[in-house]
Amino acid sequence: MVMIQIELPDGSIKEFSETTTPGDIAAGIGSGLARQAVAARFNDRMVDLCTPITESGRLEIITLNSPQGLEVYRHTAAHLMAHAVKDLYGDRVQVTIGPAVENGFYYDFYCEDHAFSPDDFEKIEKRMQELVKANLPIEREEVSRDSAIALFRELGEHYKVELIEDLDAPTVSLYRQGDFVDLCRGPHLPSTGRIKAFKLTSVAGAYWRGSEKNAMLQRIYATAFPDKKELRTYLNKLEEARKRDHRRIGRELDLFSFSEEAGAGLVIWHPKGALLRTLLEDFERREHLRRGYDIVMGPQILRTDLWKTSGHFDNYRENMYFTDVDGQGYGIKPMNCLAHMLIYKARQRSYRDLPLRYFELGTVHRHEKSGVLHGLLRVRGFTQDDAHIICTPDQLDEEIKRVLEFVRDVMAIFGFEYEIEISTRPEKSIGSDADWERATGALMNALKDLELPHDVNEGDGAFYGPKIDIKLKDALDRRWQCATIQCDFTLPERFDLTYVGKDGEKHRPVMLHRVILGAIERFIGVLIEHYAGNFPLWLAPVQAVVINVTDNQADYAKSVSDALRAAGVRVQCDLRNEKLGFKIREAQVDKIPYMLVVGDTEMSDGTVAPRFRSGKNLEPMSPEDFARFVQEECDQYR
């Protein structure tokens, strides 16, 4: 008799004389593992716990406390929600897709005669609880493609039919729980009773298959956790995130707006927001000049032929906007790199000229689908702090280290911790093995030399080169992709960039794309939520407000305001005939760092009484001393 040999992650081997399942193997190892098991990976393929194992291979039990396990748990919760919605709304609703996503899951529904709202959530959650209590077995079924089409057509699930018709496979997998059936690859939990804690959180619109040409669906977002304590912790964090929502704070502080008249995803900056953005951009310019970058500028539109040369036309044109000028096609730039290539090519370069570091705060436009637009965090028009570093191969290691040090210093200024990932060569790529080895080695060496911890994403680099991604962590422990360092073998080749080496021969330079903050709009959105609108003094659009106690001090308050403004302080003067407490509270709501109260005593002494927005009072001081105080506080960022 041939034994089935199963190799476990620790290298141990278990033998079985007959067919077994991952669930049985987990139970044989220990009851604790069996309770935590949600799925398995057998020979690098994700499977259910009840999947029969009939051959030898490698097995890993996937538990609930792993990212993959939580994804399986939430994917099953998505099916549970769809089941509940179908039970409650019947044939009025068609189900479409429902994946697990970061921090939860969603399911998209088509329903002509009912608009889902938070008012429906309690009813849906109640039905979900009933299905959990019923502990329905969740069973996988392999059927022919034609049988699946016939089944879902009979059920009136036309979106499922469309999905299956687009598949080439002769068979598809279905998952059943009670009278609910869904098209799915799996894996899933063994039964509905394994789901312990969930909450529906919001509803939004989403186009079928992400195309505005298709029907508008209703997307219900939700989350699920292994226990109620974890769920409560997450919901508390979610509530705090709502309070910090940059769209709400941006409106309350009069920073920016969006208008359907202008177009979706296009930011309109109000005076305070434009000033905040200007302060941030000025900071970037100073830092780049200090670190040896040259500031450059490129046009907003470039000829279509140039986008064909770069490869963007073939690979990115669906995300671009095009126009015609005097019969000549032009593309509105979605990226800043092409003008930088032309600047380099404007004259012959020598090895003595390198490295060249071109920096541009360049505004770009990308045709993002309307369903993914989200305040400042996802827009169609935005400005990137793009730089392209063109250097010799021998200079690559040092240039990468310089960029990483730049990122480290900037993140410290804003108070962000961050995580680093390096992505290596994918299966489909361009460039020689030597190019990839040199570039990947340079990225790795820089991280090692600077003692920066990092994760490696094998095979996740771009086709044109390896990269480092830096994700900052905000006050709510959320991750945001901002800085990127990307090696590029494509553009130097496509634009025939060369330099004359010490040997008098022409050589191909190495190029790095890099951003530090990324999109300025997105970074400001992250800053607003990180600080909850309480910007540090150097970034605050209004640094202080002068508040008079009575009309007697109005002239003095105005003179103080004028003097501070002349000294470079961004100041307002509140002379309204309102009570002092009211004006102080309003300044706190506006998140102005300092309130300078002036009454008869201050007027007589020629001073102001500073009060921080937290309520802490400073000793009275002269307007000149306060201006110096602000100057010293902000000098480190100038």
Curated annotation (Swiss-Prot):
Region annotated Catalytic, chain positions: 245-536
Keyword set, alphabetical order: Aminoacyl-tRNA synthetase, ATP-binding, Cytoplasm, Ligase, Metal-binding, Nucleotide-binding, Protein biosynthesis, RNA-binding, tRNA-binding, Zinc
Q: Which InterPro entries does the protein's record reference?
A: aa-tRNA-synt_IIb, aa-tRNA-synth_II, aa-tRNA-synth_II/BPL/LPL, Anticodon-bd, Anticodon-bd_dom_sf, Beta-grasp_dom_sf, TGS, TGS-like
**What lineage is on file?**
Bacteria, Pseudomonadati, Thermodesulfobacteriota, Desulfuromonadia, Desulfuromonadales
The identity of this protein, by name, is Threonine--tRNA ligase
Q: Which superkingdom heads the taxonomic lineage of this protein's source?
A: Bacteria
**What organism does this protein naturally occur in?**
Syntrophotalea carbinolica (strain DSM 2380 / NBRC 103641 / GraBd1) (Pelobacter carbinolicus)
Q: Which cofactor does it need?
A: Zn(2+)
Q: Does the keyword Ligase apply?
A: yes
Q: Which Pfam families match?
A: HGTP_anticodon (PF03129), TGS (PF02824), tRNA-synt_2b (PF00587), tRNA_SAD (PF07973)
Q: Which HAMAP family match?
A: Thr_tRNA_synth (MF_00184)
Q: Name one GO cellular component term.
A: cytosol
